[in-house]
């Protein structure tokens, strides 16, 4: 879902408006207009957060209605296990040798091709066709972590809907099957992924 602020406000025009305000010699008027613009942007942002949260909850409810359950679990053991299955497959030397590689996001292992993941539509198909045992969902910048019950009902389209309606901190989604040793990742960057990788 595109941010509401981008739909109702052209940022280039906003910057021009801010430049015009800066040229006003009357300090009191300049400050009043600046404050009003800040309040407008804040309200639009609040509205955007509200709309995204509602849309995300609707998608989650649709999954629940189909029998898919997201059961909260403790994050750290899942992250540690994921790292032990995937991150440890790439040496620190290989990571350092990769130009511009950053460990800021776990999915960089795949976007920098340090691990040979299937990408795009092939990754979606691989996810849909994979045997789903015990499946977990976690994020790079959120503490929420879930065990996905009845994961065999979950599709790549469901994940696209979750991602499209997620807030920024939930926008890097990692699905992880520790029994079958595969991961499916939907990054926040629209032009990256999704990625599917199975450890041998």
Please report, for each region that a protein language model flagged, where it lies by residue.
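Structured alpha/beta or helical-core interaction and ligand-binding surfaces enriched in interleaved
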Residues: 1-200
């Amino acid at each position: 879902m595109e941010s509401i602020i981008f739909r109702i406000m052209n940022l280039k025009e906003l910057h021009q408006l801010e430049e015009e305000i800066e040229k006003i010699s009357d300090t009191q008027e300049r400050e009043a207009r600046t404050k009003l613009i800040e309040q407008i942007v804040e309200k639009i942002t609040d509205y955007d957060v509200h709309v995204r949260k509602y849309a995300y909850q609707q998608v989650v409810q649709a999954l629940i209605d189909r029998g898919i359950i997201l059961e909260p679990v403790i994050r750290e053991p899942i992250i540690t296990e994921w790292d032990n299955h995937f991150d440890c497959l790439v040496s620190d030397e290989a990571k350092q040798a990769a130009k511009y590689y950053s460990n800021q996001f776990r999915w960089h292992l795949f976007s920098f091709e340090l691990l040979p993941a299937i990408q795009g539509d092939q990754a979606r198909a691989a996810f849909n066709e994979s045997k789903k045992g015990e499946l977990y969902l976690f994020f790079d910048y959120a503490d929420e972590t879930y065990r996905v019950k009845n994961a065999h009902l979950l599709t790549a389209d469901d994940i696209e809907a979750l991602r499209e309606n997620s807030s920024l901190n939930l926008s890097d989604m990692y699905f992880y099957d520790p029994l079958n040793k595969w991961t499916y990742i939907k990054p926040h960057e629209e032009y990256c992924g999704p990625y599917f990788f199975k450890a041998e």
